Amino acid sequence: MEDKNGAPHGAPHSDSPLGFSHAAPEEDTPAPELAPEAPEPPEEPRLGVLTVTDTTPDSMRLSWSVAQGPFDSFVVQYEDTNGQPQALLVDGDQSKILISGLEPSTPYRFLLYGLHEGKRLGPLSAEGTTGLAPAGQTSEESRPRLSQLSVTDVTTSSLRLNWEAPPGAFDSFLLRFGVPSPSTLEPHPRPLLQRELMVPGTRHSAVLRDLRSGTLYSLTLYGLRGPHKADSIQGTARTLSPVLESPRDLQFSEIRETSAKVNWMPPPSRADSFKVSYQLADGGEPQSVQVDGRARTQKLQFLTVPHSCVH
């Protein structure tokens, strides 16, 4: 018996009911492994808004926000009335600073930079004008004056600043000090990074600590009446450089007619090099030889006979 397609009844069909041949099942092909995506670098912190508030005749308060953080620290920059750039370093957990020692009725423009992992980001800018001078403020000729700014007790990391002022003339003193730009040849020299120290009006000296050795500092002292600047005086001072200690236990060995070996113990502090100088005991032209700082001995040759040599 045949079905309507002509195939014997019961015979298996080679075609599907839809007219397609049955294909052998395909083996599953594993999906290609995708390389893990590189993590996106973290976004840099961003500054928000800088505003000027609490304006007085000689000060302004700057406040700022951080849109995305944190920052390691901040730098506030502005120019004084002499056109000199000034800068103040602020800790990263702070969001405001009082800028004092300004001139009355004077416009100022401030720039705020954020420092993050050695990079300077920004700036934000804001402008403000100091208030009018207080009524009855003394004239330039009659106002009390600071004088005799001097430096004593200088060490590698500190110095004492002294000054003279009329008794009772100032309520307090504001001392600003910082390191000038290392190069005046830069097209845009970096301004002073300053620190501040408040001193009671009854004291006429202050010790500056935690300074860099062998470094020149710019100093500005303000005399304040209340919050207002009455006078200022400027100067500079340099801390001492580290003193290199001398080698010790100098000895001679292997002494010959025209040569000798000199030995020494190095100082506790690191030395880049040593200079061995010698000459005839009864005078004559001094000789010297430069020795690497890691050396502990040096042979002196071509010495004159029969004289001895001294160090």
UniProtKB/Swiss-Prot annotation:
CDD domains for this protein: FN3
Keyword terms: Repeat
Superkingdom classification of source: Eukaryota
Record PROSITE patterns: FN3
Annotated S-S bridges: none
Fibronectin type-III domain span: 41-135, 145-249, 250-311
Pfam families: fn3 (PF00041)
Region: Disordered, residue numbers: 1-47, 124-150
Tissue: Expressed in the adrenal gland.
GO CC annotations, alphabetized: extracellular exosome
InterPro entries: ECM_Regulatory_Proteins, FN3_dom, FN3_sf, Ig-like_fold
Extra information: TNX genes are located in the class III HLA region within a complex locus, named RCCX module, containing genes for WHR1/STK19, C4B, CYP21B/CYP21A2 and TNXB. Most chromosomes bear 2 modules, but monomodular and trimodular haplotypes are common in most populations. The bimodular haplotype results from the duplication of the RCCX module, leading to a duplicate containing RP2/RP1 pseudogene, C4A, CYP21A/CYP21A1P and TNXA.
Official protein name in the record: Putative tenascin-XA
Annotated source species: Homo sapiens (Human)
High-level lineage: Eukaryota, Metazoa, Chordata, Craniata, Vertebrata
Gene expressing this chain: TNXA
